[in-house]
Amino acid sequence: MARIASVNIPDNKRLVVSLTYIYGLGTTMAKTICKKAKILEDKKVKDLTDQELISLRNIIENEYKVEGDLRREVTLNIKKKKDIRSYQGLRHIRKLPVRGQNTHSNARTRKGKAVAIAGKKKAVK
């Protein structure tokens, strides 16, 4: 397995697909990285030479924020919004959807498991 940005990427997959295993790289960005490195997108990772792997590593590490750096930046941005008490920060604090989604009937993944309301006991006739 090749190791890029401290992530083991699978050998038996195409380069574009295996680059998406890195947090912060999608298919579009993986294709642009392949073009910059002048490597065919359809090439399997196991067929890459050491020089090609080194060029991929250099491009990813020097030009893009991936993995730990990106995760850290995202969490700091969320923390900053919470600290300045912006609307989005308040939604994060309350664990509600941040970007204007409806919460009346949806948002179960964000709000957590539904808590049943204890109903009144029916009187026995």
Swiss-Prot record:
Biological processes annotated in GO: translation
GO molecular function, one term: structural constituent of ribosome
Cellular component terms (Gene Ontology): cytosol; small ribosomal subunit
Entries under InterPro entries matching the protein: Rbsml_uS13_C, Ribosomal_uS13, Ribosomal_uS13-like_H2TH, Ribosomal_uS13_bac-type, Ribosomal_uS13_CS
SUPFAM superfamilies: S13-like H2TH domain (SSF46946)
Any one Pfam family match given in the protein's UniProt record, by short name: Ribosomal_S13
Keywords tagged on the record: Ribonucleoprotein, Ribosomal protein, RNA-binding, rRNA-binding, tRNA-binding
PANTHER family: 30S RIBOSOMAL PROTEIN S13/40S RIBOSOMAL PROTEIN S18 (PTHR10871), SMALL RIBOSOMAL SUBUNIT PROTEIN US13M (PTHR10871:SF1)
Job description of the protein: Located at the top of the head of the 30S subunit, it contacts several helices of the 16S rRNA. In the 70S ribosome it contacts the 23S rRNA (bridge B1a) and protein L5 of the 50S subunit (bridge B1b), connecting the 2 subunits; these bridges are implicated in subunit movement. Contacts the tRNAs in the A and P-sites.
Protein's UniProt name: Small ribosomal subunit protein uS13
Organism: Rickettsia bellii (strain OSU 85-389)
